[in-house]
Amino acid sequence: MIEGFCTNTGKDVFIHALCNSVGGYVHQNDIQNIGQFEQGNWPHLDWNKWTDKPCVVVGTLRGTERIIWECQKRNHPFYYMDHAYFGATRYYKSKGPNGVLYRLIRSQMQLNYIVELEKEDYQRIKKFGKQEWKPFHKNGEHILLCPPTKAICRLYNLGDEQLWIDTQLTELQKYTDRNIIVRKKDTKVSLQKHLENCHAVVTHQSTAAIEAILAGVPSFCDNVSAANEVSESLYENIETPYYPDDDLIKQWVDSLLSVQFTGDEFKDGTAYHTATRLQT
């Protein structure tokens, strides 16, 4: 039914859980201790013959990006897993109130559209609690630019991080003279601190855009972003950002909640069947 691809990291627990839940096949990797930007190897995968089953990967490192690219080239379905949008648990073992949480996205890396939830979906996401967001403040001063990581630059063929930064700065400065703060992932300043007195956040597909919207800061992003439905994309509008209303934000938040699942939901088939139903 599906074929999962392991990378010999803690992430593999999600590959096994999802595949086992529907009788899928797990491709073991015959290379140990694969570096983040090195290639693993799945000896039972024939890259030429490929497969007629949807593929399953976690993240974009250790060769999983090759699976994603091949699926995209062939217009072949795949399932992508990564950190949850809300209440994310890190390092695959840490547990929050609902245990380990991960998201499951079909044939892309982010959920960039609003899905139509059914009664059972609203019931399931209640356990994540009510998500709060602040009203948009419209008197911010600086612009916060959040560049993609090296892995994301590679995945989307964006060049390197500095090239992306330079390109966005050049474009933004055509339309604004505001101070632009570049926030790299390794910064010691918290995102919430950077969002204080912020006019707008600019990202490619970083989940920082989600936190920005919830903090009352408008977002500019690429259409592959999970914040796509509540954001602007044209820099010419940087001085007049888009402010989505509460009804749209609620639909958007519920959509993101609907694609994240607990460890048990990955094991019992809920994750696979729900993601397939909502995202097909």
What role is predicted for each listed range?
Residues 1-55, 151-152, 272-280:
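N-terminal pre-catalytic "stem/leader" segment of glycosyltransferase-like enzymes
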Residues 11-22, 64-65, 159-172:
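Well-ordered, non-membrane alpha-helical segments in soluble/globular domains
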Residues 30, 35-93:
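Extended catalytic core of nucleotide-activated donor transferases of GT-like folds
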Residues 40-49, 170-173, 178-227:
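Donor nucleotide-activated moiety binding/catalytic core segment of transferases
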Residues 92-140, 175, 229-280:
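Leloir-type glycosyltransferase catalytic cores
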